[in-house]
Amino acid sequence: MAATKITHEQLREELRAGNKPVDIAKAYSMSHSVLLRRIKKLKATGYDPANDRDYNNPENHPVAGYSTLVRHKSASDSSTGKVLEWVKTRVDVRNQMDAATAMIDTMIADIKPLPVIPFKNYVATSDQFTVIPIGDPHIGLMTWSKEVGEDWDIKIADRVYRKVFKRLLTNLPDTEECVLVNTGDFFHADNIQGETSRSRHKLDLDGRHGKWLDAGFVIMRMFIDACLRKFKKVEFINVPGNHDDILGRAIGSYVWQLYRDNERINVQKGDSPFQYVRRGNVLLGFAHGHTCKLSSLPGKMADDQYKLWGRTTYRHWICGHVHHNSWVQFKEHPGCKVETVGIIPPKDAYAHGGAYGADRGIQGIIFDKKIGYSPRRIEETVRGTD
């Protein structure tokens, strides 16, 4: 017999009636542990009779705290001395992200696709393919040279990215395909308050929300258009980061809508924090790197892609998040390698205060479809003249 799902209101009434959790679980054909988790969720909405609280907030507005007015107890007071209480709630981040993603998909559904960019280059090899990870661009970041040693804003970011990316593409071989990867944190902030959605950290930003949002989409188009001119086929991998849970996913929808008429580009929007590409004997995984330990990624790949794991001989993860290039000493796990990539923006005030420092640049990694990893790796660093 299928279990009857108990609603929040039914559970509330059962508890008000004094029924024990073990009896409620039996009545609704539920396990005791599942019911206890439901009670925990119910308490998050404001139901806590042990502390004289019986509120009924929406599930997507969990209680963040209480402000209670108390006085010396009198006969008319509650047992706790409470006179009035204000319930403070917060918007559940996961529900907020899901709602925002649906809204974004609806808003951009009518975007007119861009004209198809013709391929006029030539293909030197189809046995290899190029991967270009764009490490944590943090578009919108602003730094002050007197504080961190270098000025950085939207205008500087646009100029530097164009110069460095052009030099990189010039030096890369003309493989048939390029895998262009947004490794996450494309935008420095995620809302109009200039914060991340997860931590609500206040960030140093160059101007208003719309200003750096527009600049970011222009820079992303520059990356993709340049790759479409050089490579016959482009696979765009979008991986949202911890700085841009919502806007990072919006990038995937935006790019897909703009280039949906171009058969030379395939877009992975970023619905999952883990994205995969298989080419010949090579299986690649892409993640920002903030949702789990890097050492857990080989097992994650084997679990998610167990069929492709068995059909390939070389497996490799490419991640962002840590802002430094670890390919020289990247970690070799049984059956899989894991590396992180560097970034182009300078360190912000927080990183500067923590004595962080690393070379700044972008790289192209050439993989061989038959043998896997190729020692060919071309890196372009930021120059003082950029």
Report residues per predicted region.
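Short, amphipathic alpha-helical "recognition" segments used to contact nucleic acids or chromatin
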Residues: A2-N19
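Basic, amphipathic N-terminal segments that precede the first structured/catalytic domain
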Residues: S31-D174, D368-K370, V382-D386
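Short alpha-helical "recognition helix" segments of helix-turn-helix
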Residues: D23-K26
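Histidine-centered active-site/metal-ligand motif
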Residues: H32, H138, N242-D244, H288, ...
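Flexible, charged surface loops at secondary-structure boundaries
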Residues: R16-A17, A124-S126, L172-T175, R278, ...
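Conserved beta-sheet core of the metallophosphoesterase superfamily
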Residues: L228, V255-N266, G270-D271, R278-G285, ...
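Core catalytic region of metal-dependent phosphoesterases/phosphodiesterases
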Residues: F119-K120, A124-P137, S145, E150-G252, ...
